[in-house]
Swiss-Prot record:
It comes from Homo sapiens (Human). The gene is PRR23B. Residues 256-265 have a biased composition (Basic residues). This is Proline-rich protein 23B. Residues 226-237 have a biased composition (Pro residues). Residues 1-49, 226-265 are annotated as: Disordered. Residues 1-18 have a biased composition (Low complexity). The lineage of its organism: Eukaryota, Metazoa, Chordata, Craniata, Vertebrata. Belongs to the PRR23 family.
Amino acid sequence: MVSRPRSPSAFPAPWWGQQPGGPGPAKRLRLEEPAGPEPRAAPSLEDPAGDPAVDALTSIVVLAAGCALRVPLDDVDLVLEPAPTSILRVSLGGHTLILIPEVLLSSVDERSGAQHDSSAGLEVDVFLGAVREDVVVELEFCASVPEIAAQEEAYEEDADPEFPELRMDSPTGSAAGLYPSSRSMFIPYREGPIPEPCALAPNPSSERRSPRPIFDLEFRLLEPVPSSPLQPLPPSPCVGSPGPHARSPLPERPPCKARRRLFQA
């Protein structure tokens, strides 16, 4: 009597037990068992969720020699001034400020391939080689306080519409009793002669302003003043033209005796 082998589909049995040369059950079981939770990968620098510092704004400010950066806060004004040979980094909430003196940038540009051991120069190279999307470069121009005050005062004087600039003649430059009916004066940003100057209203701030130079180029068409005792001289008579005061011609004299004898001979 011959027995037929059982169908594998009717009675499922592990086939690795019937194959003598197959892999062991332990290895197969380890390959087929459900995998456990994978370890969480460490956040990379490109992952914005893993590194919250990427969202912060970073500004690089280049300061000239002897200048400082004023940052207005809620209650006070913060003045930041780095040392001439160092770089200052300040974090204000989500904003990071990096202050670089202009001297360090000029020293980095002048290296031209020469090697030096300055740590400040290396730090400048690191900041300048940062990613452009994460760094906002801001160039800051500063000046000393007296220069700024002088410039503001000059701007206020130039932009004051209530007190237009007028150039009046000096009393010593004109003749007594005569006044010019048309005058040409030097006025910046204005061309052509101007009418007679009018009196200005008293200005309380005019005392502090320095007197400005007055330039009179020429006087033309001098006319006499009716109330002045000085009157212009009459025009001089022209030579060769008879005028009302010209002398009458002399009567002809008879020729002398010698002259009569000469013509009679």
